[in-house]
């Protein structure tokens, strides 16, 4: 279970014998179509508390449990375990955001991060002496016929995992993880990633639209109001894997600064 921890900076497995200034438990998730961690933790409340107690002994500093502002996660009262609440859209649920706001790292200061399901697995190991071989994942996306939460094996084959929810995968891309940071299924990488709590299924955007740039775009989503679809508030759009064109330069017009919570630009 040691590889469940990741160092910040650099997101590496901690060296044996190393020590963290603090440990961050990510118990919130703002990725699109992700599961609500509170629901999963409630099914394994005792194991989660047991896991918190174990990992809290790995640092002389504090263990921060980062949750959504209105969630109720067990573990209050454990010495040196402090709960931090975050509110807002993605990336409010990312460990990097939490660390930047609570205990920023530097070249001489390292913290560790671990996901809530790995905390449950550690609690299971120390409570039963056996490895936990299952994980709860959210399966969703425009090509999913029956989205929901499913229990799958750790490292499960992606095609097998989505078979019950999406039997037809023609011209679809199965993504291990979020559409924002996940990994597309490939013949040699057709398995659930170690740190992924969701599987997303998208339509392959492998077709070109003739003179699409001249159309009003009422069927397209837009953040910057360049398409007519931006007038249709509340409408859901079936996203595909298309990026709408080739790679382009990042032009400093303030768009990225509005969605970047960290002071790095």
Model-identified regions with their sequence ranges:
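Buried, small/hydrophobic-residue-enriched core segments of structured protein domains
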Residues: 1-265
């Amino acid at each position: 279970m040691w590889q469940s921890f990741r160092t910040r900076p650099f997101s590496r497995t901690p060296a044996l014998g190393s020590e963290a200034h603090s440990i961050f438990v990510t118990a919130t998730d703002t990725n699109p179509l992700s599961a609500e961690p509170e629901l999963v933790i409630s099914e394994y409340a005792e194991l989660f508390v047991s896991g918190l107690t174990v990992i809290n002994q790995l640092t002389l500093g504090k263990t921060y449990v980062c949750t959504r502002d209105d969630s109720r996660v067990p573990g209050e009262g454990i010495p040196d375990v402090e709960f931090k609440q975050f509110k807002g859209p993605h990336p409010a649920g990312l460990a990097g955001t939490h660390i930047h706001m609570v205990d920023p790292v530097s070249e001489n200061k390292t913290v560790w991060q671990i996901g809530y399901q790995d905390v449950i697995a550690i609690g299971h190991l120390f409570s039963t002496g056996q490895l936990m071989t299952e994980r709860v994942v959210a399966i969703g996306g425009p090509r999913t016929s029956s989205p929901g939460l499913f229990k799958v094996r750790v490292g499960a084959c992606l095609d097998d995992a989505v078979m019950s929810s999406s039997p037809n995968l023609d011209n679809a891309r199965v993504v291990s993880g979020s559409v924002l940071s996940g990994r597309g299924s490939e013949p040699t990488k057709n398995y659930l990633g170690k740190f992924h709590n969701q599987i997303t299924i998208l339509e392959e955007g492998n077709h070109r639209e003739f003179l699409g740039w001249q159309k009003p775009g009422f069927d397209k989503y837009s953040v910057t109001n360049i398409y007519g679809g931006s007038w249709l508030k509340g409408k859901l759009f079936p996203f595909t894997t298309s990026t709408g064109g080739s790679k382009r330069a990042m032009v400093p017009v303030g768009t990225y600064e509005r969605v970047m919570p960290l002071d790095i630009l």
